[in-house]
Structures are given as structure tokens and as C-alpha cells.
Regions:
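Predominantly extracellular beta-rich ligand-binding scaffolds that present long acidic/polar faces
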Residues: 81-94, 99, 354-356, 373-500
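Right-handed parallel beta-helix
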Residues: 244-255, 268-301, 306-311, 316-337, ...
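Extracellular beta-strand/beta-solenoid scaffold signature
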Residues: 111-126, 196-202, 231-238, 256-265, ...
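Extracellular polysaccharide-degrading/modifying enzymes targeting complex plant/algal/animal polysaccharides
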Residues: 2-267, 279-303, 312, 491-500
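Intrinsic-disorder/low-complexity regions
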Residues: 40-47, 70, 99, 112, ...
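Intrinsic-disorder-associated interaction segments
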Residues: 1-5, 9, 357, 475, ...
Length: 501
């Protein structure tokens, strides 16, 4: 093991800054073989969109357009678009022009407007947003200089109650104890669909569930205190669904409480995400069913939060995330995952390459949870290579009950049947908990590790690796013997290890 000197850490910061600048400055080199359509802030949806001089204006026009496979939509650099895009099969979404990557933000407007806020509780300095809003993962102030702590009350007996004491009604005035605390109260639509053996009414959470947002702001009206307030609403920005062969290239996708780019189904083919900036993602409430596997003690009425940068939930064949800068994500920067529930899913030909990931709870996540008798599902030909993965568990997503889950590579401890799975040439730079969590039922399903660099604080966990058919592998410690541990237990070929005092 080498010790990470001040000079080493300074050089590491410089390397990451160069990588970040390279990604943010990526040229528009992607080729569109079909018809190209253009979109800009000063366009008109009545235009045909067929040239930069006759662009469309809105994302709704893009979503509703009858695009064909091979077509592409280019958004003007320097422009800001709000809302989401319903993608079409075989279509490329990219940039044109000069300047910064075109920006896609989740909510309809910036909230730094004094007229959007009214004083709700003078004594406790709590402000109410005057317009209805979707559930939000958090609020981000001044481009990331500060963010809110989201409170997540449970719902029982027709009202909100405190998560840690369900016998105590939730009152914002009593529970919002810190500056910039926020809570969303959304219970206009209820469902009795059963969960956890119960069927009492709980709030419906979907794209139509609007309600009230409350924010504690000790310095006054938030719209006067801050010049920039972005909400992370429960909304996907690029909804891929089951559309095959979608490409998203050279876009900046930020501020959404669900997923930046989301696909899934039986077998999603050919999703490519390249040269993108993705930040401040996730944290919205998925549901109140109480089925969060990381909070098994929670009953019906407790929340599950979620939100990933790029996600495939289901089978896939040909899935690439490459040369992207992803940061401040509530869950994973990028992930492929499925609970099979007795079905058959193949997750094939997956590539996560040359990305820079910072301040996410999971830099890269995968899992294959084979349940209800499934014995056939598998992962095959997975490559995680050339990535710089930094500060797992040190971002805003740690405002969660399960603070022991962060990892740079998070495979959890499921069956995770896999073949030809390689993790090589990556830099793992500090994690609040495990650096790696690579467990499968059988040892041969664990990834081959080669030429990876590990930088971690001495005494913190290195992680877990190995088979769990008989027992869960132990959590390994990152200590002076970490290099030997990596060679002997993880089977890492040619590791490079730096300890941080």
C-alpha cells in the first residue's frame, strides 16, 4: 500500500478536473441517418423543425412528433428546456450549435420568485409554495451551494404521522427544526391497493399527484433570499420505457426527483447514453406501500424514495453509458436491475465506460434478484472500465435511514447469476461505507477484478466480495493490508492501493 500524500491528492483533483472539462466540452460528433429536427427556445411549434432556422420550441412538440427509426432531434446549445421527453424507438436526442450543452430541468419554473411564496408560520419561519407541485426529492439553491433536508412522514389513519413515532401526528411547525427543511404534503388521491397484509388508504404517487410544499427559510422569503431555486419533481426527463435503440448524447439533464433517463421491460435493446452531464437527481417518494427492502421494519404507509441517473429496470441487450459526468444522485448514477418475480430476464452486453461519477450513493449499481421460482435469468457480458468513481455516500443522498449502504459498485447480496463480468481499470476514490459490494450466490458469478485503483480512508470498509450460498461474506476493512486483501479475497489482478490518513 502507498499512502496518499498531499501531492498525490492534489494531482488526483487535477486529473478529475481535466476529465470533467473533457466531458463538458465534448464535441457533437454523432451521426443521424434519418431526418433531423431542431428545437430552440425561440422556435415555434408551428414550424416544421427541419432546419435551425425553423425550429420547434417545446418538449411537448418533440414528444408528440411522429418520429421514425433513424431520425434525430437536436436541441440548441445554451438553451434551457423544462419538463420531460417521451422518446421514440430508434431516435437520437442530441445537441447543435455553440456553447454549453442544452439543459433539461425537471420542474416547470425556477422557484426563486418572491410571489411564489407565502409566510405560513411566522414563529417557525416556514413558507408555503403558492402553486401546487409534484412531490420533490429536494430543493437545490444557487446551483448546488445548498440543498434542503426532505422530511418523509408516514401516512396512517387518514393523516400524516412521524416516521419514527407513528403515534405522533406530523405537524410541520414541530418537525421542521432546521433551516431549509422541506416537506411535501400530497394526499389528494388515495388507494387501498393492499401491501404488507393491509389495505387502509394511502396516497397515490404518480405524475398527476400534486400537493403542497413547505420550506423553512430562516432568512425570509425564499424567493428574495435566493437567486436560484430548482425543485427535483417526481418526473422522468427522458422516458425511454421499452423503446429500443434510443440514443441520448451531449445533453445536460438535471433537477428531477425520479430518473434522468429511464427504460425497462422484458428486453430493452440498444440504449446508449454518451457525453452527457447528469446531476441532482432523485429522492422523490415512489410509494407509501412500506415495501422498501432497506427498511423492512416499516409498515404500510411508510415511504420508499428512489431516483437514478440512468436506469434500466428489466432485461436488456446492448446498454451503454459512456463518457458522462454524473453527480449528486440520490441512488445510483447508472444501473441495471430487476426483481424477476418468477419471470425470465436476460441482462446482456452492458458497458459502463470512461464516466466520471461524484457524490452519488451508488456510483454504479446492478442486481438480479431471482424470486418466485426463477432459475433461468442471468447477466452476461458486463464491462465496467475506465471510470473515475468518487465520494460515494458523501452527497445529498445520504439524507436516508439506510446510511450504511453506499458503495462505488453496488451489487447488493442477491443471486446475481452472471458470466463474463469484468471490472477493470477504474479509479475508486473514497466511499463513506463500502467501496465495493460484489456478492452473488455462486463465486463464479462475481466479477473479475483487474487493474483497479483504490483510494480510501484507513479504517473504513473496503467492502464485500464472494459467494453467499452458505453465508454472507464478511465486510473487509481498508487497512494497511488492503492490497493483500484485494489479491487474496477479491482476486484483484494488479491492484493499486492508496491509504488516506
Amino acid at each position: 500500500m502507498s499512502h496518499a500524500t498531499k501531492e498525490f491528492l492534489t494531482a488526483l483533483e487535477e486529473t478529475c478536473a481535466r476529465r470533467r472539462d473533457e466531458i463538458l466540452g465534448s464535441a457533437d460528433e454523432i451521426t443521424i441517418i434519418g431526418q433531423t429536427y431542431y428545437v430552440s427556445n425561440d422556435g415555434d411549434d408551428g414550424n416544421d423543425g427541419l432546419s435551425p432556422e425553423r425550429p420547434w420550441r417545446t418538449l411537448r412538440r418533440v414528444s408528440e412528433a411522429p418520429l421514425s427509426e433513424g431520425d434525430g432531434v437536436r436541441f440548441r446549445r445554451g438553451d434551457l428546456f423544462r419538463g420531460g421527453v417521451d422518446t421514440k424507438p430508434g431516435v437520437t436526442y442530441a445537441a447543435y450549435g455553440e456553447g454549453d450543452k442544452p439543459k433539461f430541468y425537471g420542474w416547470d419554473k425556477n422557484l426563486a420568485d418572491p410571489s411564489l411564496w407565502e409566510l405560513w408560520d411566522k414563529e417557525h419561519r416556514i413558507w408555503h409554495l403558492t402553486e401546487p407541485i409534484l412531490d420533490c426529492g429536494t430543493l437545490v439553491f444557487e446551483g448546488g451551494q445548498a440543498h434542503s433536508r426532505k422530511l418523509i412522514p408516514s401516512y396512517r389513519d387518514g393523516g400524516f404521522v412521524c416516521r419514527d413515532d407513528e403515534g405522533r401526528p406530523f405537524h410541520p411547525s414541530a418537525e421542521m427544526t432546521r433551516d431549509l427543511d422541506m416537506v411535501c404534503i400530497i394526499d389528494g388521491r388515495l388507494t387501498s391497493h393492499p401491501s404488507k397484509g393491509e389495505n387502509f388508504p394511502i396516497p397515490i404517487m404518480d405524475g398527476e399527484s400534486l400537493g403542497d410544499l413547505y420550506l423553512r427559510c430562516d432568512r425570509g422569503n425564499p424567493g428574495e433570499v435566493f437567486g436560484d431555486i430548482e425543485a427535483l419533481p417526481r418526473r422522468r426527463i427522458f422516458a425511454v420505457g421499452g423503446n429500443n435503440n434510443v440514443t441520448v448524447d451531449n445533453l445536460c439533464i438535471k433537477y428531477t426527483g425520479e430518473h434522468a433517463i429511464a427504460g425497462g421491460g422484458g428486453c430493452l435493446r440498444g440504449l446508449r447514453v454518451t457525453n452527457c452531464e447528469i446531476g441532482w437527481i432523485g429522492g422523490a417518494i415512489q410509494h407509501y406501500f412500506g415495501t422498501d427492502p432497506n427498511y423492512p421494519e416499516g409498515g404500510r404507509g411508510t415511504v420508499t424514495r428512489y431516483g437514478n441517473g440512468v436506469e434500466i429496470y428489466g432485461g436488456c441487450d446492448g446498454y451503454t453509458v459512456e463518457n458522462c459526468y454524473v453527480y449528486q444522485v440520490y441512488d445510483a448514477a447508472m444501473t441495471h436491475q430487476i426483481n424477476t418475480c418468477g419471470g425470465f430476464f436476460g441482462l446482456r452486453n452492458i458497458r459502463y465506460r470512461r464516466n466520471l461519477v461524484e457524490y452519488c450513493v451508488y456510483s454504479i449499481e446492478y442486481f438480479l434478484d431471482k424470486t418466485q421460482g426463477d432459475t433461468r435469468s442471468f447477466m452476461e457480458n458486463c464491462e465496467i472500465s475506465g471510470n473515475i468513481l468518487r465520494f460515494s455516500g458523501y452527497g445529498w443522498g445520504q439524507q436516508r435511514h439506510n446510511t450504511h449502504t453506499p458503495a462505488h459498485i453496488k451489487g447488493w447480496s442477491f443471486e446475481n447469476t452472471a458470466r463474463n463480468f469484468r471490472i477493470r481499470g477504474n479509479l475508486f476514490d473514497r466511499a463513506a461505507y463500502r467501496m465495493i459490494h460484489l456478492v452473488a450466490r455462486e463465486e463464479e458469478s462475481c466479477p473479475v477484478m483487474e487493474d483497479n485503483v483504490y483510494v480510501q480512508r484507513l479504517g473504513l470498509p473496503l467492502g464485500q466480495y464472494g459467494a453467499n450460498a452458505e453465508a454472507e461474506p464478511p465486510i473487509l476493512v481498508f487497512d494497511e493490508g488492503a492490497e493483500e486483501t484485494l489479491r487474496a479475497i477479491v482476486g484483484e489482478i494488479n491492484p493499486t492501493v492508496y491509504g488516506v490518513e
